[in-house]
From Swiss-Prot:
Organism in which the protein naturally occurs: Psychrobacter sp. (strain PRwf-1)
SUPFAM superfamilies linked to this entry: Ribonuclease H-like
Residues at the active site: D8, E72, D144
Required cofactor names: Mg(2+)
Molecular function (Gene Ontology), one example: DNA binding
Protein name: Crossover junction endodeoxyribonuclease RuvC
Assembly mode: Homodimer which binds Holliday junction (HJ) DNA. The HJ becomes 2-fold symmetrical on binding to RuvC with unstacked arms; it has a different conformation from HJ DNA in complex with RuvA. In the full resolvosome a probable DNA-RuvA(4)-RuvB(12)-RuvC(2) complex forms which resolves the HJ.
Record-level GO BP terms: DNA recombination; DNA repair
Gene: ruvC
Cofactor binding summary note: Binds 2 Mg(2+) ion per subunit.
Amino acid sequence: MAIIIGIDPGSRMTGYGIIHQKGDTLRYLDAGTIRTDTKEMPERLKRIFQGLTRITQYHLKYSDEPIHAAVEQVFMAENPDSALKLGQARGAAIAALVALDLEVSEYTARQIKQSVCGYGAADKVQVQEMVCRILKLDVTPQQDAADGLACAICHAHSSHSMNKLLMNSTLRGRGTSKKKGRWRLTEEDLASLK
């Protein structure tokens, strides 16, 4: 069980989505955007940092479960100035999460779309629709918030798949242990995989 915060960074609007994962089940907790209407970049970065800090602290305060964070990686924009601003916004988001001692995983837009839609070149509307289906939402979230939720879903799928893969390979894996060339799991190992 875990809470996952997904972030879609942007210099004018940063989307976030928060889900609860229990095994294969994903449940919506929260989503929204942090708007930075000011023209000055330092003020925008401050708002992103403070907004994500406030949202994350709320969930840290009211949850006993571990919190994971996932952030969309920067794509190469045609305009270098846009790419730089996006990178700065992403840095402010990551700094807010790391300042609260969260581990941050990063995913490309293609990885997120592939995980959520099954197609790495899906458009924003397709991502919104699939987020609604996966989380059983009655109301379609705003695009940036849906992208934040999609990032969280991607992390849930990735971490759950990795745990299953680890469990299967560990149970069936062959190693160089002295006991018939098979790995042996202790109760502690099994508990750590849950």
